[in-house]
Amino acid sequence: MANTLEQLKSFTTIVADTGDIEAIKRSQPEDATTNPSLILKAAQIPEYSGLIDNAIAWAKTQSDNLETQIEDAADKLAVNIGLEILKLVPGRISTEVDARLSFDKTASIAKAHKLIRLYQEAGIDKSRILIKLASTWEGICAAKELEAEGINCNLTLLFSFAQARACAEAGVFLISPFVGRILDWYKKSTGKDYRASEDPGVVSVTDIYNYYKRHGYKTVVMGASFRNTGEIIELAGCDRLTIGPSLLEEMAASNTPVVRKLTPTTDTVAPGPVMSEAEFRWEMNQDAMAVEKLAEGIRNFAIDQGKLEEMLKAKLA
């Protein structure tokens, strides 16, 4: 009998949520995703020192200004790690725009262009890159413009139906609705434990998936942020699932049967009017969990970006 991971792969495209190249070699995913926290973690792996040295050396050729060098080195390091991962996966790498730009559409677009240029200079076509942006109104608007240029985007830190609807209406390539962080909030808020089938994060992704398929949206749904394998198995059939190394390895060592839970409907209905900015902001405001988790996620990614830059600054000085 195939192990749990192999069974899941028959229903869903598996993506590795890590910057650890050795972990990717073991799990053999289709794609991989990174974020500022994962880049910071990867930068502390001794085997990656050459990638850091390369980023530092490159940054020094771009500017004499230390702050500019730090920013350039951070961008180049994220791309360098992405380049190594692309040697191991047949599909795409998701590389994230600085979380501190989450409320600046123009700066987010400029950063996306820079990341794409760095990949292209290394011989990687933009068709293998997903630009990750936080699912703020500004991030979604930035993604809409980037998609119009042929730059595909992955909208992350997505916790609400309003975010999912706005992303679909903007025509973004892929969304990453979070599962585990939603569960964290509800467990803390209610003091309850939840069975996997009733997990609020699982329910959220299921609702988004069904809405997208019912209205014929092409945006890919990639569940993210898992706390246990039960959540993952409950989302078998989702377009994609991005999973951390420890849970991938746990499923590879398990023979738990996997049954498809999500199936696209063949009965589609045209969507209604496009959501306005005012509607988006009101619906977000009414969802305390989504407001809190989005803000917390942006803050935490910004903190880790700052830590990475401090590490690079010490090497540049």
Swiss-Prot record:
Annotated PROSITE patterns = TRANSALDOLASE_1 (PS01054), TRANSALDOLASE_2 (PS00958)
What is this enzyme's catalytic activity, as reactions?
D-sedoheptulose 7-phosphate + D-glyceraldehyde 3-phosphate = D-erythrose 4-phosphate + beta-D-fructose 6-phosphate
Location of the active site: K132 (schiff-base intermediate with substrate)
| InterPro entries, sorted | Aldolase_TIM (IPR013785), TAL/FSA (IPR001585), Transaldolase_1 (IPR004730), Transaldolase_AS (IPR018225)
Q: Name one GO biological process term.
A: pentose-phosphate shunt
- Which species is the source of this protein? Shewanella amazonensis (strain ATCC BAA-1098 / SB2B)
One example GO MF annotation: transaldolase activity
In UniProt terms, what function does this protein have?
Transaldolase is important for the balance of metabolites in the pentose-phosphate pathway.
EC code(s) of this entry:
2.2.1.2
Q: Which GO terms describe its cellular component?
A: cytosol
Q: Which UniProt keywords apply?
A: Cytoplasm, Pentose shunt, Schiff base, Transferase
Q: Main subcellular localization, coarse class? A: cytoplasm
**Assembly with partners or alone:** Homodimer.
The protein's location, in the record's own words, is: Cytoplasm
State the family it belongs to: Belongs to the transaldolase family. Type 1 subfamily.
Put simply, this protein is called Transaldolase
Q: In which pathway does it act?
A: Carbohydrate degradation; pentose phosphate pathway; D-glyceraldehyde 3-phosphate and beta-D-fructose 6-phosphate from D-ribose 5-phosphate and D-xylulose 5-phosphate (non-oxidative stage): step 2/3
- Could you tell me the gene encoding this protein? tal
Pfam families, alphabetized: TAL_FSA
